[in-house]
Amino acid sequence: MSKKIQAIRGMNDLLPKNSALWLSLEKTIFDLFITYGYQNIRTPIVEKTDTFCRAIGGDTDIVEKEMYSWKETSGESLSLRPEGTAGCVRMMIEHNLPRESIQKVFYQGAMFRHERPQKGRYRQFHQVGLEIFGVFNAKADAELMIIMHALWQTIGLKNIVLEINTLGSNEVRNAYRKILVAYFNQHKNQLNEDGLKQLKTNPFRILDSKNKAIHSLISDAPKLMDYLDKKSIQHFKQFKSYLDALNITYVINTSLVRGLDYYNRTVFEWTTTDLGTQSTICAGGRYDGLIEKMGGTPTPAVGLAIGLERLVLLLEAQNLISTKSTLSIYLIAFGKKEQIKSIQIANVLHDELPNVILYNDLTLGSFKSQFEKADKAKANFALILGEQELNNNQISIKPLRNQGTQQTMNLEEAIKYFKENQ
């Protein structure tokens, strides 16, 4: 017996019954971004591995353990993208876009990481991202928060907290890194295997550790805030003043460092307690040195990404999945002439009722079987074309969800009827 074919663990199918929610959510997000002046971009899901090594850092867990990478016959190493910013930056450099003007862009698509699959964490996951290139002012950082705040209000999200922090300039961060390493080296005996590795590769990640045994050690660690330069302090102060002006509530979390090496100054996360350990819904920050690091002209930048799977899980947890459905019609016809006429009627209805879902039965089955399919499709109305209707140049409308009694009328009247009942 052949082995049952199935998807790769941690890479999930989006089934037809769930796709309407995703399409509606994505449209809501994209429409909002566009109203704030952001333009859509698309980058390949495969990049040169070096692109991610240079952006994320070659000694990070993402690059060392989590990326899906392989070598071409030419010997060049390629990788599936584990996140979206590196590809956006590569695109900006390659096409000299920041030189033209300030770039405000958004992207969407699948990302890939070889992780242990669990609820809210998958090997293939989907993100929507916002990026601003060419603006150093904290007003750009604040605009991203304003957009997210507007999105949460639009979709009705509750119990979500904005956490913010500043990592200072790259120079301050590098100096603080040495101080942090010296501190944790004095307490190496309290660190587990992961902590010891992070001490060598990225000591900032220790500050974000979920290991409860070292929480007191972390709370006693030197604070980055005590080493900030004046420009970083002023930038963070401006950022907070914009949030205060719009009554956007936030919490300053000095342990918030973000998992990617390229961040500096402002970092932020929108978190919730409704999803257990996978609490981050949206996160990002400023990465002013990344374009230069990857070979481009020095360009300030700030961005964020939303995890769509987690956002959907949160909507479900908060019972915010809308039950409102688009008006749907199931066109039922019986007989060869009626089937041909039904195709013509369907064409007219699609033109006249562009926002209505129209199912035109393709099975050529009995009236009974077609009605059963209409019921299974959860259509609001059955549009019936039988011999009598065809001869009289009419069509019958049968409500399927207790909206009234069956009526017979001409097509023009039927179109008017549906427009009034949308």
From Swiss-Prot:
Is the keyword Magnesium assigned to this protein? no
Coiled coil residues, start to end: none
Q: Return any one Pfam family short name.
A: HGTP_anticodon
Gene Ontology biological process: histidyl-tRNA aminoacylation
PANTHER family in the cross-refs: HISTIDINE--TRNA LIGASE, MITOCHONDRIAL-RELATED (PTHR43707:SF1), HISTIDYL-TRNA SYNTHETASE (PTHR43707)
Extract the HAMAP family matched here.
His_tRNA_synth
The name of this protein is Histidine--tRNA ligase
- Organism annotation: Vesicomyosocius okutanii subsp. Calyptogena okutanii (strain HA)
